[in-house]
Amino acid sequence: MMRSMFAAISGLKAHQVMLDVTAADIANVNTVGYKSSRMTFRDSLSQQQRGGAAPGPGQGGSNSAQIGLGSQVGSIDNLMGGGALQTTGNTFDVAISGDGWFRVGSSTAPAVPTAKEYTRAGNFPPNDQGYLTTQEGLYVIGRTAPAGAGTDTLIQIAPGAGNISIGQDGSVSYQPTGGGPRVTAGYISLAKFENQSALERLGNNSWAAGPNAGPEVVSTPGGTYGITQAGAVEMSNVDLAAEFTNMITAQRGFQANSRIISTADQMLQDLVNLIR
């Protein structure tokens, strides 16, 4: 009887985590670049009541008898599918149509950040020195040349520059003050990972490379990395219909486990009453 209560308690805890994951997704339904999560369950230990036996001469075998001891959180997976692109018309809003990740970091300009973070939230307003930054002030890491060539660099727009544009190849160019040919300030760089689901959330739309993600592979937009769409941002990939379904599932699972506890408690109460 106590087994049933402990199993139900583990079910309550697991379904509470499921509801927590669902709530976080719904709360971020309009967060730029947000990636939703999914929780899976797995069973806990099982207590063996009777061992199994192999068939013998003149008789068949028998299966073991085991009683499960509840459930637990199996995994919380990051769902890295792309979100819808929302047109903003802002020159410094950039969305990725593909699998790449923007590379950002903190440093003292013009030094390139050594500790890198990754994001899909591509709203990059320039700071007072003209460097492209995130909303949190992290520098956008670019490349001095397209594709696999060049080295890492920060992307700086010259003071007074006009006609600023960001191309599908990640190139950031502008018309310098006083005229003359257009200047390419750099190329927005993108990173890919063998297992991008292993990236770890840092908050503020940033991610870190987890130990199971593999090394970053850097390039500029193009190919499987995706192209950059200027004047747009990637919205959250949260599927509200799926999240509401998960919410109902978590609620009903929580209620069912609560009923198990109530039933076991009533049985214990009946047993106590028999003793009186």
Describe each region flagged by the PLM.
Residues M1-D152, P159-R276:
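Amphipathic alpha-helical polymerization modules
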